[in-house]
Amino acid sequence: MLLSRAISVVALLACICCGVHTQDSKADLGTLRTTDSAIITSQRRLRTSVDLVDNEERFRWPFQQFFKDRWHRKQIKTYFRDQKDNVSEGLVEQLIARHGLKNVEKVLSEVKFPLAVQISIRKILVNYKGKQAFTRPHLTPADTL
């Protein structure tokens, strides 16, 4: 947006220097300046008027979620390495609840399992996703079909 404003200001300045539309261009240039400054001040007000208690996410570092997800995946990998042949449905659901479905699916795509265990884990994930869809208040079983 600022780039388009800058281009239009440069175009107006070129027109003023050449003598084309001098009266109208000066008025447009003044309007552009006031509009830009109004936009910038409103953005500054929004940034400075944030309530610190309600908006904690503003102070999160961009890489914080990356390291958190990485830690969760490491925990899941250690569990799956220890229980490679003997994976139960309840424990997989606990892992999903504790570490998130996205992290469990990511680890499952990286870790190699025997085929029977892999099929049972996929069934658990499908059942878990189905339970999630039915427990959402705005969805009915007819909506998910």
Swiss-Prot record:
Belongs to the RxLR effector family. The RxLR-dEER motif acts to carry the protein into the host cell cytoplasm through binding to cell surface phosphatidylinositol-3-phosphate. This is RxLR effector protein BLR40. Keywords: Host cell membrane, Host membrane, Membrane, Secreted, Signal. Residues 1-22 form the signal peptide. It comes from Bremia lactucae. GO terms for cellular component: extracellular region; host cell plasma membrane; membrane. Secreted effector that triggers a robust hypersensitive response (HR) in Lactuca sativa cv. Design that is resistant to multiple B.lactucae races, including Bl:24. It is found in: Secreted; Host cell membrane.
